[in-house]
């Protein structure tokens, strides 16, 4: 199972640095990993409607008779009612939404793992190495991996097939 430590170590290896043995280590690379990992991965997940991180949600009113966007939602793609901030305004009993949600590294597909490691390497590059040329190289690699990851993600949809109903049954 892939962990935060694994992803951060992959990023450090892309920089030519030694991998981490622990995120709690007392080193500059471990401190960067602790500080930047969550925000970097959340920004990467919310920056595109990744299918592997997209969920259909049904939200019920809370005890105050309000709808609140769940904490694991990074980006709302569609909502059946009016959304303002993290509140949903509706007279209905439940609200449906399609959202990009926070997921653990162990659930990342391989094409996203490489992209995430490269993005983390970009974030770690200047604080650790101070090398602008390495950063430019990582940016170029990231842009290429991002396009590839979006393509793979967009072509992995499962075709539900043709729905069953009388006209289709009569034709086929």
Regions found by a protein language model. Give the residues of each.
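Internal mixed-charge
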Residues: 1, 6-7, 78-172
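Long, hydrophobic N-terminal alpha-helical segment
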Residues: 1-45
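Hydrophobic/aromatic-lined pockets within catalytic cores
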Residues: 12-16, 20, 41, 45, ...
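Solvent-exposed, flexible loop/coil residues
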Residues: 24, 56, 112, 116
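Sparse recognition of residues in long alpha-helices and their boundaries
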Residues: 27-28, 56, 136
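Short, well-structured hydrophobic secondary-structure segments
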Residues: 31-77
């Amino acid at each position: 199972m892939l962990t935060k430590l694994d992803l951060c170590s992959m990023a450090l290896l892309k920089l030519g640095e030694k991998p981490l043995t622990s995120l709690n280590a007392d080193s500059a690379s471990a401190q960067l990993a602790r500080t930047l990992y969550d925000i970097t991965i959340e920004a990467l997940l919310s920056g595109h409607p990744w299918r592997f991180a997209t969920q259909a949600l049904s939200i019920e009113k809370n005890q105050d008779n309000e709808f609140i966007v769940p904490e694991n939602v990074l980006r709302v793609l569609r909502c059946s009612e009016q959304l303002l901030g993290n509140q949903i305004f509706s007279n209905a009993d439940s609200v449906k939404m399609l959202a990009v949600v926070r997921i653990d590294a162990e659930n990342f597909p391989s094409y996203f793992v490489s992209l995430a490691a490269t993005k983390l390497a970009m974030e770690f590059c200047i604080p650790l190495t101070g090398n602008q040329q390495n950063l430019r190289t990582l940016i170029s690699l990231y842009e290429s991996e991002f396009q590839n990851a979006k393509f793979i993600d967009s072509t992995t949809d499962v075709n539900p097939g043709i729905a069953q109903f009388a006209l289709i049954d009569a034709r086929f």
